[in-house]
Structures are given as C-alpha cells and as structure tokens.
Curated annotation (Swiss-Prot):
<dbReference type="GO" id="GO:0005506">
    <property type="term" value="F:iron ion binding"/>
</dbReference>
<keyword id="KW-0012">Acyltransferase</keyword>
<feature type="binding site">
    <location>
        <position position="287"/>
    </location>
    <ligand>
        <name>substrate</name>
    </ligand>
</feature>
<feature type="binding site">
    <location>
        <position position="176"/>
    </location>
    <ligand>
        <name>substrate</name>
    </ligand>
</feature>
<comment type="similarity">
    <text>Belongs to the KAE1 / TsaD family.</text>
</comment>
<comment type="function">
    <text>Required for the formation of a threonylcarbamoyl group on adenosine at position 37 (t(6)A37) in tRNAs that read codons beginning with adenine. Is involved in the transfer of the threonylcarbamoyl moiety of threonylcarbamoyl-AMP (TC-AMP) to the N6 group of A37, together with TsaE and TsaB. TsaD likely plays a direct catalytic role in this reaction.</text>
</comment>
<dbReference type="Pfam" id="PF00814">
    <property type="entry name" value="TsaD"/>
</dbReference>
<dbReference type="InterPro" id="IPR043129">
    <property type="entry name" value="ATPase_NBD"/>
</dbReference>
<feature type="binding site">
    <location>
        <position position="189"/>
    </location>
    <ligand>
        <name>substrate</name>
    </ligand>
</feature>
<keyword id="KW-0819">tRNA processing</keyword>
<feature type="binding site">
    <location>
        <position position="125"/>
    </location>
    <ligand>
        <name>Fe cation</name>
    </ligand>
</feature>
<feature type="binding site">
    <location>
        <position position="315"/>
    </location>
    <ligand>
        <name>Fe cation</name>
    </ligand>
</feature>
<keyword id="KW-0408">Iron</keyword>
<dbReference type="InterPro" id="IPR000905">
    <property type="entry name" value="Gcp-like_dom"/>
</dbReference>
<keyword id="KW-0963">Cytoplasm</keyword>
<dbReference type="InterPro" id="IPR017860">
    <property type="entry name" value="Peptidase_M22_CS"/>
</dbReference>
<dbReference type="GO" id="GO:0061711">
    <property type="term" value="F:N(6)-L-threonylcarbamoyladenine synthase activity"/>
</dbReference>
Length: 363
C-alpha cells in the first residue's frame, strides 16, 4: 500500500471499557472520512463496583465485539473483501481486552488475506486531529484520560517525543478517585465537574503541584491527599461541602495543568520550533472548565487549540482505524505474531518522567 491510494480500514478498540469498531477512509491526499463508528460503553457493567473490573471488561468484549464489528461494516456499506487493512489496538491497556480485540483483527485479516496493523492506542489519540482537522505536523499533544496524562511532541506518523508525564495519578484517575472519596457515582469525572459548578473554589487552600518547575511533569497525589484530609475533617459532609471540595480540587488541577502545559510548550519550541497547534485528546478534554483553560493556554502560547469532537476524544474505533490507515499509507504493517501489550510507551526512549528523546514507535 502507498499514500497514493485510497485506503479503507476497519479499526477495533478494546483496551479498557469501551467495545468499539469503525471503518475509516483515507484518501490519497491524506484527508479522511469516517464511514461508521460504533461504540458500546460498559459503564453499566462496572458502575456497581465504582470502577473498571478487568475480568468483567474482557468478558464483555468477548460478548459484544462480533456484533459491533458487523454493525460497523454494515453501516459503512462495505464488506471485508473491500478492506485495505484491519487495525486493532494492541496496547497499552487491560491485557484481557487487548487480547480480545487483537485476536479478532488477526482472524479477520487471516481469513480475508488483508494486511494487519497493530496500533498503539496512544498513537491513535495522537493522530486523531489529522482525521478531524487535517492538522499538519508538528503539533503538541496533551493527552489526558483515566489512564494517561502526557505532553507529547507529534512530529510525524510513528515519530513522537514525550515532553512530560504524570509521576503518579493521571488526571482522569484523580477525578475518579476524588468522586469515589466523596461518595459521588461512577464515572466520577463528570460528577466532579457538575458538583464543582455549584461550589466555592476559594473555600479551601489546596496545593498546586509542580508549579513553576522547569520540566513539564504532573503530580496529583499530594492534591488528592489534601482533599481527603479536608473531607475527613468535615465528616459528615453536607452537599455544599462536597460541591466546595470538588470546586477547589478542580481549580487546583486547572492551575497545575496550565502551568505544566506552559512548560511543555516551551520545551517544544526549544526543541522543534513553533507547534502548528496544541491538541487535546482523551476523555478529560470533555470537561468544559478544562477546555476553557486550554483555550487560555493556547492563546498565551500564540498557537491554535484543537480538540476533536467529544465522541472522538474518548476511546473509539475510528481513531484506531485512522492510525492504521496512516501507517498503512507508509507501508507499515504487522505479522500475525504481533503481541498484545499491557504497557507500551509512545516514546520508547522516555523511560523516566520528563525524559525526552526522538524515536520511531516500533511495532
């Protein structure tokens, strides 16, 4: 396959608690079009436990994936014989789910003699703005989700430099833990955002972790502990206490995030010049307060903020299909012994928080 062809790729996503499949077209000029994008969330299955249970997630993927793939193909109006490639998220993620998705993709590719592309889930997030907005390289990615918080220089397909990461909790993880601590329902992120809208952020003097440091790393464990200490002091909590705690927590996250992104953008400019855009991806980007803060950060850095539509910020099959198509256009495919991975760094040389070194993402 070459970039001069129109490519049709099926993408499969099963790394956490969304079972998803999509068909995406990549045209010869590099533009893309989503033909179908089917996502089945497992929130109802995991809500009684207050978080994702890996075994339940894997079993749900087994039960759901065949039907979701069939629906994606039907909605796209195409057949397996017409596919240019089959892409699956091969990690990082919950290993049981990753195995389900990758094995399914291998079976389809083998039966129909179609190229297989084993996609890094993080790379799929990184390349989504090229599908939605035709964003040109290089750009600065802020990936914030329940499992990941990273600032990444996106220099090309498979060419990434991690500028900053969290040394403890991911932002989405911290939101979920605060929600659980305060007795709010799962999933916690939207609940904290909703409560914060009715709270007084100035009531508590919560710390702003890592503020002013020259690196671009994040830390949220100390902030989380400060919230826990205040909640324990106020027990039993009144509804307004919960709102104020959420507001104070979210305000501290916003201040820390803005400072850390500012540092990341400075590192980007020092190494690679001005970014074409600041791109936000991951489920945390759906938080409206965070979006407002990101707009301010981008304006201060004199760059453009790009945020994919909410349905493409959270885990989905279209981003996997698109990353597969981008790699396929460069002739990058995988063999049937491609392994599922629970851990898979986007920048393979970034072994310590804040270390950055240019690398090609290998498969």
């Amino acid at each position: 396959m070459t970039s001069e062809q129109t490519l049709l790729v099926l993408g499969i996503e099963t790394t956490c608690d969304e079972t998803a499949a999509a068909v995406v077209e990549r045209r010869a000029d590099g533009s893309g079009r989503i033909l179908s994008n089917i996502v089945r969330s497992q929130i109802d299955e995991h809500a009684p436990f207050g978080g994702v249970v890996p075994e339940i997630a894997a079993r749900a993927h087994v039960d759901l994936l065949d039907g979701i793939v069939a629906n994606a193909m039907r909605e796209a109006g195409t057949g397996f014989a017409q596919l240019s490639g089959v892409a699956a998220a091969a990690g990082p993620g919950l290993i049981g789910g990753v195995i389900v998705g990758l094995t399914t993709a291998k079976a389809i590719a083998l039966v129909h003699n179609t190229p297989l592309i084993a996609v890094n889930h993080l790379e799929a997030h990184a390349l989504t703005p090229r599908l939605t907005d035709a964003t040109e390289f290089p750009y600065c990615l802020f990936l914030a989700s329940g499992g990941h918080t990273q600032i990444v220089a996106v220099l090309g397909v498979g060419d990434y430099v991690r500028l900053g990461t969290t040394v403890d909790d991911a932002i989405g993880e911290a939101f979920d833990k605060i929600a659980k601590m305060l007795g709010l329902p799962y999933p916690g992120g939207p609940q904290v955002e909703r409560a914060a809208a009715s709270g007084d952020a100035a009531r508590f003097a919560f710390p702003r972790p890592m503020l002013g440091r020259p690196d671009a790393n994040f830390s949220l464990s100390g902030l989380k502990t400060a919230v826990r200490n205040e909640a324990s002091r106020l027990t039993p909590l009144e509804p307004q206490d919960i709102n104020d705690l959420c507001a104070g927590f979210q305000a501290a996250v916003l201040d820390s995030m803005a400072d850390r992104l500012g540092a990341g953008l400075r590192l980007f400019r020092e190494r690679f010049g001005a970014p074409k855009a600041l791109v936000a991806a991951g489920g945390v980007a759906a938080n409206q307060a965070i979006r407002r803060s990101l707009r301010e950060v981008a304006a201060k850095a004199q760059t453009t903020l790009m945020v994919p539509p909410p349905a493409l910020c959270t885990d989905n099959g279209a981003m996997i299909a698109w990353a597969g198509a981008e790699r396929l256009a460069l002739g990058l495919t995988d063999t049937m012994d491609a392994a599922p991975r629970a851990r898979w760094l986007l920048d393979a040389n970034a072994t310590a928080p804040g270390k950055f070194a240019n690398t090609r993402a290998g498969f």
